[in-house]
Amino acid sequence: MKNLIILALVAISLAACNQKQVKKMENTDNVQTALANDDRIDLGRFEWTREPAECEIKGDTIAVTTKPHTDLWQRTYYHFRNDNAPVLQMKTNERFFSFVVKTDFSQSHHRFDQCGIVMYLDSENWLKASVEYENEQFQHLGSVVTNGGYSDWATTAIPADVKTMWYRFSRREDDYCIECSADGVHFSQMRICHMHAGAGEIRFGIYACSPEDSSFTALFSDMKITACAWQAHDGQQPD
């Protein structure tokens, strides 16, 4: 009888230990896990804020088909608030890292069709970077930063025949850097910004949308997490 009681207590102890281990695994930080596993990203750790018309995952590629009249913008200049673009993100408390992704928008064909990277915290605090189709001559490579419910937009015109773009999103505490690349090797700075709501846990990932009456399929691939590629400033010291 005594031995049976001991065995029962051991079984209960092991079960409790296993439950704690499962809980620990479930709560593992997504970025820290990727950094510990040769930069590989488990696509199953991404979560939708809003789902697209269609989504398909094959290998390391995510195909996202947009719905018409989907967008992200808050107030500035246009005086409207659009907050219904599909956003697929993972969350992290890691304060120093970089996220890289390749986008393919060969199917974009209508004004304002776009896809790229995003850090969507809530409707009034987010950033994004993308190529936005304009016409058969050119499109906009740009970024939007929204702090406290007001968006800005910084762009440069690129040829309309550009159909792929790489992005690198880097975090250093509550400051952020967005870079772009034509080949995934040589990156150029697009934007440095501060996010007022971006000091703690954040969510970041990918998005695609079609603000007007159109739809297209965007492809996202070659995603990875690395140590922060945005190096600390080596000039004037902080105040």
Which residues make up each language-model segment?
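C-terminal motif of bacterial Sec signal peptides marking the signal peptidase cleavage site
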Residues: 14-16
